Amino acid sequence: MADKEAGGSDGPRETAPTSAYSSPARSLGDTGITPLSPSHIVNDTDSNVSEQQSFLVVVAVDFGTTSSGYAYSFTKEPECIHVMRRWEGGDPGVSNQKTPTTILLTPERKFHSFGYAARDFYHDLDPNEAKQWLYLEKFKMKLHTTGDLTMDTDLTAANGKKVKALEIFAYALQYFKEQALKELSDQAGSEFENSDVRWVITVPAIWKQPAKQFMRQAAYQAGLASPENSEQLIIALEPEAASIYCRKLRLHQMIELSSKAAVNGYSGSDTVGAGFTQAKEHIRRNRQSRTFLVENVIGEIWSELEEGDKYVVVDSGGGTVDLTVHQIRLPEGHLKELYKATGGPYGSLGVDYEFEKLLYKIFGEDFIEQFKIKRPAAWVDLMIAFESRKRAAAPDRTNPLNITLPFSFIDYYKKFRGHSVEHALRKSNVDFVKWSSQGMLRMSPDAMNALFKPTIDSIIEHLRDLFQKPEVSTVKFLFLVGGFAEAPLLQQAVQAAFGDQCRIIIPQDVGLTILKGAVLFGLDPAVIKVRRSPLTYGVGVLNRYVEGKHPPEKLLVKDGTRWCTDVFDKFISADQSVALGELVKRSYTPAKPSQLVIVINIYSSEHDNVSFITDPGVKKCGTLRLDLTGTSGTAVPARREIQTLMQFGDTEIKATAIDIATSKSVKVGIDFLNY
């Protein structure tokens, strides 16, 4: 079969199947489809970079594990980023420009409230009444930890009841939609329509395709966009957003931790956290306007960068830590990803889990698990009390940290065990936690620091592994961003491990870095020019059987023709560099000319050298569905060719298709959730 690709090819990036012909349908459930053309990647940036739409405003939602918020910028004033209104409620000493990612449903499972409002209302409920309400927090991690994520995946509320995850995420996004549109309408003095808004939602870079698709489906259900107007919603990768914002930093907007030359008057020899504390005070004094000005040009920090210089972004949030390596392209300041995003579940929640394990050791796992179920609101109160003390942990702290135990904890423990909390502490042999007569757990600084150690050790180990990669050698900067980056213990660990290798920079308003960067990304989605594929992707096809090359067990004889089954036709390799707008072209032919739907299974692997879809480590991960309805002309050709164009250089995998005979567009769906 002749190569039917259009001109403009960059040439093959990978080995094409030696021969690929159309074939009858296979008996294993796949449609009998083989590629008509070899494996080319075509640069077609003019046609596939996100089109400029006539949106009046970009609204970014930073949907975090522990806290969330939104910011926006009018497209005619892209240098002004407005952060959402201050939230009612909040904890002493904690900035409330974000709100906790907590949601409360009524006993009838209707949406009641979100954020501080949900938390405070739940706190004030009678304990028996609270058992009927559905309170959820830190639920974003479910999308990362669930291996078989589907549209029907459940979440567990504080009272143990199950609720659909899609419903909860949609409720949360709908809440932010309503809040943002109301604020925009108030500011504009007239009703602001959703169609005027381009929405941006942030997700961790290490999330797999199903989790990204899940978030998009939740946004559709919340009414932010629709499948018919999918370009109204952009999925932004959190460390990329941070990187985009860091390009704009002025010297007075950053703190340097490394032992290199001082920036902004703070040097690496200062006490870790001291400069950061001063910076936060400066932010609090200047936070009234909620409007941040960003440079139209590259920020001052990039004046020290040359073409090809590299830097690492460490996005340390509540649930995950994302590590991204970027290279600067001057003079425009475009970015190129040098190594596929890496990371893991090493967020500040790890400290909470260690505290929970400590409570297990003192009071018994059976009691703690029962207390969560019987007194869910009191458990939330206890973790809120721990959160405020967690934020006070520091390397140089000498005085104890007191954590108030709710009265219901003390009372329920006595009923459960038959003796007091104080007795439990004495018998536990946990010397570094004492009982205070004021009803508090008194933790020594070393005890609190020990709770941080496993999580911080995992981050440092992951960073060390990353710095061993050839692509990451000679890194000039390390940007530490995300809510967990505020922790002086993490700052000290990063400084100690890498301060002599590169300059370690923390943006002053570190908790809003991703949010503001997501707005900038929504204004210019093409700023990241080159990304790396996290996995190897491809499909299973039939090739002509070649004696001596193909295994005998893969031989299929159909109508006298010898076929090799299960051949892995590779679209793109793991860690392969792919530019925004580069297209992977394939042409497929239906088993029968009258066939109206082609469904092709997509497979993935962490490995590059994949030959067959049955190789170890190869998994079915989704489907590519081509809907041929309405594309055929009056006379259906005996051999139909459907050309499919796939794009792997964006934050999501995208596809388009065309019926070559009629030049009509084919409806394409890529599904990583329902396959």
From Swiss-Prot:
Protein origin, superkingdom: Eukaryota
Main location: cytoplasm
Region (Disordered): 1-45
GO biological process: import into nucleus; inflammatory response; liver development; macrophage activation
Keywords: Acetylation, ATP-binding, Cytoplasm, Nucleotide-binding, Nucleus
Tissue expression per record: Widely expressed with highest levels in brain, kidney and muscle.
Keyword Flavoprotein: no
Molecular functions per Gene Ontology: ATP binding
GO cellular component, one term: cytoplasm
InterPro entries (alphabetical): ATPase_NBD (IPR043129), HSPA12A_NBD (IPR026685)
Subcellular compartments: Cytoplasm; Nucleus
Bias kind Polar residues: ranges: 16-25, 34-45
Modification type N-acetylalanine: residues: 2
Residue stretches of biased makeup (Basic and acidic residues): 1-13
Biological role: Adapter protein for SORL1, but not SORT1. Delays SORL1 internalization and affects SORL1 subcellular localization.
Family under the similarity heading: Belongs to the heat shock protein 70 family.
Assembly and oligomerization: Interacts with SORL1 (via cytosolic C-terminus); this interaction affects SORL1 internalization and subcellular localization.
Protein name per the record: Heat shock 70 kDa protein 12A
Native organism: Homo sapiens (Human)
